[in-house]
Each structure stands twice: as C-alpha cells, then as structure tokens.
Amino acid sequence: MKSHLACCAFLLLSACAEARSPDSVAIEVRAEAVPLNPEDPAMTQLGALRYRGGLVLTSEDDDFGGLSGVIVAPDESKLLAITDKGHWVCMGLKADSDGVLLGITTASLSPMLSAETKPLQGKEEADAEAVSLTSDGTAILAAFEGTHRVMRYPLGQPGNLCSVAGATPTRLIAPAGLNDLPANGGIEALATTADGTLIVLTEKGEAEGGGTLGWMMPELGLKARAAQRFGFEPPDPYVPTDLARLDDTLFVLQRHFSVMSGVSGVLSMTTAQALAEGTAATELARFVPPITVDNMEGVSAVRSASGQTHIYIVSDDNFMAFQRTLLLKFSLGNSKD
C-alpha cells in the first residue's frame, strides 16, 4: 500500500470531456496521494474499514471544489459529484491491479440546469448538497439547500453517469415541512432503495420524537401525504451529511466541527427498516485527527468484481484555501481486495 501511494503523488492529468452538453468543460486536476494516517503512513485499518488509497484533488479552475455528494459507477471507472456552486463534476478513476486508488484519468465540469434549461445561479439556487441514482438507473436525483428542493435529472445514456450533463430536470413535490427548515439546514443526504423509496435526511430538521428529521417517500409521483417522517440519531455531536445504498445496506456519513477540536467524521451502517423503526445505526469507523479527515460530505458504495464492498468518501473544501478536497477509498472488513 505504501509504495502504491508514493508512486502516484502529484499526478497531473489532462482531462477530456465525457458529457453530451456543449457547456461541459475539460479541466486539469492534480491528484496527490495521501496516507490514512500521516503520523503512521503504514496504517491501513480504521475500525471496520481497510484503506484502499486516497487523494487530495486540486485544480486551477475556480469552479472545481465544494464537492457535496458523489456517485461511483458500479465498475468503479467513473465518479460523478455535485458542487456547492451548482456544477456536475465527472472524473475517470485510476486504480492498480489490486484495486488501490491511484489517481484520475479524466475530469470535466458542467453546469447543473434549472427546469428552464438555464445554469443555476447564486447560493440560493445552486447549493447542491446530495445526489443519488434512481432505483431504475435512468436518472439522477439532486437535493438543494437555500431554495429547498429535490430535482430529477434524466441520464442521456442510462448507465453513463457523465451523460447527466446538459439534462433538463423536473422538480419533485416536497414533503410537508421541508420549506420550514433553515436555509442552510435542509436536505443533506438522500438515497433510493431497490423498491423505489426515496430516503431523505436533513441537517438541522428536528423529528417530533427526537433525532434528525428524515422522510421516506416514493421517488416518483411524490406526494406530501405519502411521506413518512422518521428520526435519525447520529452519535453526539455529529450531523448526517450523506447516504449511500448498496443492496439492502445504507451507509450514513456524519460530520462534526468545532473551533476547539476541528473537524471529524463517522461512517455508520444501517437499513431502511432500521431507520423507520428508530434503531441506532452501527458505527463502522471514526475519522479523528491524526487520521486524514476534512469536511466529509459525500459517500458512495459499490460491489467489486470479487464481491467486496468498496466505499468512497469525498470532502467539501467550501472553496477555502485552508480546506481540502479529499477522495478516499475503503473496503469493508480487513480484506486486501
């Protein structure tokens, strides 16, 4: 692992556009390898997770950064992310023969569009926070803060995440109470289940029975009366920042920040039924310095060719020079696959 990480330091890769939109722009991204623990570079096990490589991503393009949600393709060849400025980011992923993440091969930026086919503008309209593939794999659901909403963006080519660029969205009907949430405390995480249920977690909503407010509702033909409220109890003092589903398992990413202790994160595992019943999630790993961590905001899970669970986590640098855009890869358990 150590040698693999060292050999990919500061990969500067020319990127090519993969999306259908004329506004999709190829960008250059620098990928610098980062150890799981800078104080112990040989460390690879964190709780129930095994480190499979990580990168710090930077670009000269001012619109690159602020990654707040992520989907990794089933074959792990591509990654689609959304940003706080309302952009799609599509990147090709590079791994070695052992599956260790080495870098990126391509990268492109394209504006997320409104229902009127115009690029989203300003924090109120463009603050994308969560993203999920629909259960049938034909569209991307994206959640926004500011003007709280969930938009459905059809894929130009089902199976090709990057083909969402240039898509004209439709707006899903919001559950009752969503618009009462603070501008910066709305939907922070979402995922779809195999049966077409959309699971939503807020950042600052409070459930009647305690915990962070969430909803379960149909992902299509959404009606406020069909939304089932539930409360999610993250470990104190964390708040949920993203959800990812793999088969019947839900992975919940959570974050905490304080001036005194800095930033930290928790990854937990649960199911839709457990969420509905108010059962506590199972903690898999805790990201606390000196472990590599930043403003953890996006998680995606895929099944490898050999059947292992691979988990990808991205951080949101808020377009701040003192924060980082991290892309970290893990496998569940202690397998080297």
List each model region and its residues.
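Sequence/structural signature of beta-propeller domains
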Residues: 16-337
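Bacterial N-terminal signal peptides
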Residues: 6-14
